[in-house]
Amino acid sequence: MAWVQIRLNSTDKQAEQISDFLEEIGAVSVTFMDSQDTPIFEPLPGETRLWGNTDVVGLFDAETDMKAIVEALIASRLVEADFVHKIEQIEDKDWEREWMDNFHPMQFGKRLWICPSWREVPDPNAVNVMLDPGLAFGTGTHPTTALCLQWLDSLDLTGKTVIDFGCGSGILAIAALKLGAKQAIGIDIDPQAILASGNNAEANGVADRLQLFLAKDQPQDLQADVVVANILAGPLKELAPNIITLVKPQGDLGLSGILATQAESVCEAYAPDFNLDPVVEKEEWCRITGVKK
């Protein structure tokens, strides 16, 4: 069976609305891509992480009247009348097989691997987290997730408690548990994230050591030895008082989801309470870590 796809650029705020609309008018799948054709990997709390320059790609049956699709998009007012788009025919493939072939085990730091369940574990003696791609899991990890995983791998988590603030799929909390943490707590504003984290913890045999809370139900006196938050710079600054109280004295803090250009302003929000390490950059993103005073 042949296919045809439409690709259009969108703002962050409108990308998900356009995705929903394309599905309503017949798209069999919709993918978010960044400017470098990288699919989305790790969701933010309550939403799909979208880059500032996001392409929305809708796949349709080859017999679809694409002129009508374009007209419907314009009529929806989700795009301008002269919006830039590209329509192209796609050769018939075994899409499920190709989709699965794109996912490979990935190593973070010295000990940690993230592996899809259908792939053979490269090193049985390593710390292996089995995580199957979902809607927001791309062909490679987003730099901010990689930065957080590498940081967790560098810590001695033996016997410690870890809070994953904005847990999404639970990947960071689960990795911490597999790396030796005694207990992990995942917090998110999205019930779907809580469900996904629980399912992924079950698949990795650590569900009995993972507590999950919606942000509104977070215990008032909650604290941990290690807190990691892979969200955006805005929320990291706005929620700084809350995040700071989650870290025990002499505890470790790891923050990401931050553009390198935003590092200074985020550091200013945490510097009074933490001895901060040098900022670590990966591509245009960065990680901020420190020890609570």
UniProtKB/Swiss-Prot annotation:
Belongs to the methyltransferase superfamily. PrmA family. PANTHER family: ELECTRON TRANSFER FLAVOPROTEIN BETA SUBUNIT LYSINE METHYLTRANSFERASE. Keywords: Cytoplasm, Methyltransferase, S-adenosyl-L-methionine, Transferase. GO terms for biological process: methylation. The keyword Signal does not apply. Gene3D superfamilies: Vaccinia Virus protein VP39 (3.40.50.150). GO terms for molecular function: protein-lysine N-methyltransferase activity. S-adenosyl-L-methionine binds at T145, G166, D188, N230. It comes from Actinobacillus pleuropneumoniae serotype 7 (strain AP76). It is an enzyme of class 2 (transferase). InterPro entries: Ribosomal_L11_MeTrfase_PrmA, Ribosomal_PrmA_MeTrfase, SAM-dependent_MTases_sf. It catalyses: L-lysyl-[protein] + 3 S-adenosyl-L-methionine = N(6),N(6),N(6)-trimethyl-L-lysyl-[protein] + 3 S-adenosyl-L-homocysteine + 3 H(+). The keyword Cytoplasm applies. It is found in: Cytoplasm. Its EC number is 2.1.1.-. GO terms for cellular component: cytosol. Methylates ribosomal protein L11. This is Ribosomal protein L11 methyltransferase.
